[in-house]
Amino acid sequence: MSTIRLTILIDYCGEIVEIVPFLFDIIQETHKDIYKETTEEIVKGNSNEGQSISPPPHQPSTDQADIEALKDSYDDFLYVSKAFASCSINSLIATARIYGLNPAPIKGARVLELGSSCGGNIIPQALYYPEATFTGIDLSSVQIKHGNELIESMGLTNVTLLEKDIMDIDDDFGTFDYILVHGIWSWVPDIVKDKILSICNRNLSDRGIAYVSYNTYPGWKRLEQMRDIMLYSEKQLKSQSLQERTVYTKNVLKLLGETMNMDQRSQERSGYKIANINSVLASNDYYVGHEYLETFNDPVYVSEFIERA
């Protein structure tokens, strides 16, 4: 079976300065209610001369516990579901035709979205394209429930949301003309990454298009520095909810940005770094939490993705 795979790349660029050593002393002093029992552990963790403050690189696990943890995370801290123009059916068809391909027509098309959340990306398309059918799956029962309530209230009959693990999709699930995977691939364990690519091969129709977005290098080399700072600053707060940890780490970045702004030389040399901090601070908490504080965020070079696919 011949398939069409179009890869849409999301390339984030940013950079963060090395953290000021005394910054955590200030943070601990101003957040005694949270850090009252952690000072000893932080000092112990920095006892070696020249030791890096960044956490060790995450080693992806294939344990089912990681998948369950992701489900709990999105159940507890909902990710607001939105429509993305880049993976709308008309956009994918137009892009395919530009490259000389002959994609499946919208009429009668079957569309599958992996990690659909509340359906914010496919419900508008189901409304706009009544002759196509849409199926979204997501681990989060809470998000699926919200999405189905919206579908019912709108009286739509051509879109379905299912609480389902990507790992459970097999050949019997059927084939689809369009498979959408927006904001999922970089944020799941390797075993799920491989399963996504398998679905894009085995469950894609002959004239199908698979859309996969992911974080890429080299742009994310810079943002990983910011992620390291956030992970380090919240590593003693694992008993707190993701939402609480997100608020806390944004305050850390705010303090870092204010500290840099106090120094004229930093402003002149690192204005773009301050801008990156401000960009995170201006972002919604649900985005920052799931983007920077989840267990998995694995950017790759485009060539690496192509080799893996």
Protein language model regions, located:
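Conserved alpha-helix/loop element of class I SAM-dependent methyltransferases that forms part
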Residues: D76, F84-A109
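Conserved SAM-binding loop of SAM-dependent methyltransferases across substrates and taxa
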Residues: C118-E131
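Conserved SAM-binding motif I beta-strand of class I
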Residues: T133-D138
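Conserved SAM-binding strand-loop segment of SAM-dependent methyltransferases
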Residues: G155-I166
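A short acidic, Gly/Pro-enriched loop at the edge of an enzyme's catalytic core
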Residues: D170-I179
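A short glycine-rich, Lys/Arg-flanked "PGG" loop and its adjoining helix->strand segment in the class I
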Residues: D194-D206
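Conserved class I S-adenosyl-L-methionine
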Residues: I209-Q240, L255-R265
